[in-house]
């Protein structure tokens, strides 16, 4: 007597369980990791999504919760495991795991705690997905992207930090609020360190190609009567404010990471301000990672756009570089 499945379905081709072609792994199922996972699922970017964490109950619960929504998604396979074998053959590995930033704590204070976590994560990622692109989200992201690059042995174009993609998004949102224009039509770049010492490039701020600095030569300076400098100040303070109000940030960074994942997985060659090794650029002489406009595709970072920065902007970038290098050279890994 055949079973019901055999009565219902006639098998034509034996399923050989071919490996996923567009697999994405998210390491860490905290608030940020799950916001990344959900945003990626809503964009239909992967044919397999793998979740990894050290807390097995939460990990299984998050996986099951997503699986139960499969009817509403277009990602056929969602898996999880504490063992990194579940991540095998990933095209993109997104690292969100790490100690959470506390209220009032600077991103740089998190460093050594998260370095120790990376010493376990990165070798396991490399073991099972030696050809993957690494996208680091954990804070302080610029230092930890450097750490991931050093530990992984990957070429620099395949180790990317989410960097100022979110800072620039916040900047464009706040700019739009001030002008009454949607953020997508407001153009401006925040570069350098993700966070406290990020650098707004005021000369590039425009709407429909109209430079705001042409209309207001004092834009972003202390002499600016419209106080546009406050917009960047809000960008810097916004994460701290959200953490104070709800305990952590999640949705905006999740959407930002999915935006980067889309460009990489679809080989779109869009330009994003992401953290990459900037040695040799803008007078930087050390192995530091900072955000500059990068062309992204399925090989990672293929090109860097050479921005025309003012002397004071370059000086701020170099100061960020010096600060980060001062921290990096003291790290133990």
From Swiss-Prot:
Catalytic activity annotation: (S)-lactate + NAD(+) = pyruvate + NADH + H(+)
Domain of life from the UniProt record: Eukaryota
Keyword Oxidoreductase: yes
Assembly mode: Homotetramer.
Pathway note: Fermentation; pyruvate fermentation to lactate; (S)-lactate from pyruvate: step 1/1
PANTHER family in the cross-refs: L-2-HYDROXYCARBOXYLATE DEHYDROGENASE (NAD(P)(+)) (PTHR43128), L-LACTATE DEHYDROGENASE A CHAIN (PTHR43128:SF10)
Gene3D superfamilies the record matches: Lactate dehydrogenase/glycoside hydrolase, family 4, C-terminal, NAD(P)-binding Rossmann-like Domain
EC number: 1.1.1.27
Role this protein plays: Interconverts simultaneously and stereospecifically pyruvate and lactate with concomitant interconversion of NADH and NAD(+).
Primary subcellular site in the record, as a coarse category: cytoplasm
Gene expressing this chain: LDHA
Binding positions for substrate per the UniProt entry: 107, 139, 170, 249
Family, similarity comment: Belongs to the LDH/MDH superfamily. LDH family.
Enzyme class: oxidoreductase
Active site: 194 (proton acceptor)
Annotated keywords: Cytoplasm, NAD, Oxidoreductase
Protein name in the entry: L-lactate dehydrogenase A chain
């Amino acid at each position: 007597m055949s079973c019901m499945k055999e009565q219902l379905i006639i098998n034509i081709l034996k399923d050989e369980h071919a490996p996923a072609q567009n697999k994405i792994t998210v390491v860490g199922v905290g608030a940020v990791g799950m916001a990344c996972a959900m945003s990626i699922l809503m964009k239909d970017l992967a044919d397999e999504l793998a979740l990894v964490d050290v807390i097995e109950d939460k990990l299984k619960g998050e996986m099951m919760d997503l699986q139960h929504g499969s009817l509403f998604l277009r990602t056929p396979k969602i898996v999880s495991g504490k063992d990194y074998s579940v991540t095998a053959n990933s095209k993109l590995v997104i690292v969100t795991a790490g100690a959470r930033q506390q209220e009032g704590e600077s991103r740089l204070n998190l460093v050594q705690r998260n370095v120790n976590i990376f010493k376990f994560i990165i070798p396991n990622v490399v073991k099972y997905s030696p050809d993957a692109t690494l996208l680091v989200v954990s804070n302080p992201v610029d230092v930890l992207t450097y750490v991931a690059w050093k530990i992984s042995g990957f070429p620099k174009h395949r180790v990317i930090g989410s960097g100022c993609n979110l800072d620039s998004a916040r900047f464009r949102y706040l700019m739009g609020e001030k002008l009454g224009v949607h953020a997508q039509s407001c153009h401006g770049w925040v570069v350098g360190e993700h966070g406290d010492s990020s650098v707004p490039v005021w000369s590039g701020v425009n709407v429909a190609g109209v430079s705001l600095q042409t209309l207001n030569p004092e834009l972003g300076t202390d002499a600016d009567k419209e106080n546009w400098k406050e917009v960047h100040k809000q960008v810097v303070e916004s994460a701290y404010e959200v953490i104070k109000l709800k305990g952590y940030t999640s949705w905006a960074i999740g959407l930002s990471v999915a935006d980067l994942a889309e460009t990489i997985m679809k080989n779109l060659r869009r330009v994003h301000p992401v953290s990459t090794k900037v040695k040799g650029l803008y007078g930087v002489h050390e192995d530091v990672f900072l955000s500059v406009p990068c062309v992204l595709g399925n090989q990672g970072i293929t090109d860097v756009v050479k921005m025309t920065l003012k002397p004071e902007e370059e000086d701020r970038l170099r100061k960020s570089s010096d600060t980060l290098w001062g921290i990096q050279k003291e790290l133990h890994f």
